[in-house]
Amino acid sequence: MKTFNNVPILQYRNKFGSLEEKKADLLTIREQYDGTLIINDSMELIAYADGLHIGQDDIRAYSDDLVEAVKQIRLKIGRKVLGLSTHNKEEILEANSLDLDYIGLGAYRATHTKSEANVGGKTLIEAAKHSKHPVGMIGGVTLDDTFEEPIHYKVIGSGLYL
């Protein structure tokens, strides 16, 4: 299996490219990577991926009733992987009633895209204990960070470039 440095899951995130650019990117990634490919927020790209990661604001665009929102999303993606961003214990408890495959939890540390005001650090690890879903720690996570249960994955973005 071709993976990038033993990376089993890769999330594609491109907030600014055109739909055609994103499709071309995903096709290129598919040629070089056969691990699980997740897209961020872009339902229109689901045919090119193994799953969808969605944020708190984006899920509410489907319905303010999160159970109903996930039902609507599942109608479109079927049993492909579905993940949801969470930031605190309250959102984790909400997510427990949803048909998800994992949650992203963060931000762990400040980054250029996540301000100090949104950072939870070690308190997030305590919050993660309440999740019935596998938890991926996100936001300021580096290759050198290590986590134990209840954290199942570390999600590295800008930390790849340090």
For the regions a language model picked out, list residue spans one by one.
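Short, acidic/polar
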Residues: 1-4, 40-44, 87-94, 142-145
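Structural motif
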Residues: 4-7, 49, 98, 130, ...
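Hydrophobic faces of well-ordered beta-strands that scaffold small-molecule active sites
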Residues: 8-12, 37-39, 52-54, 82-84, ...
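Conserved, mostly hydrophobic/aromatic
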Residues: 10, 46, 95, 103, ...
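An accessory alpha-helical subdomain
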Residues: 17-21
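Alpha-helix-loop-beta-strand connector modules within alpha/beta enzyme cores
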Residues: 23-41, 65-87, 116-143
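Glycine-rich phosphate-binding active-site loops on the catalytic face of alpha/beta enzymes
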Residues: 54-70, 102-118, 140-162
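Internal catalytic-core helix/loop-beta-alpha segment
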Residues: 76-109
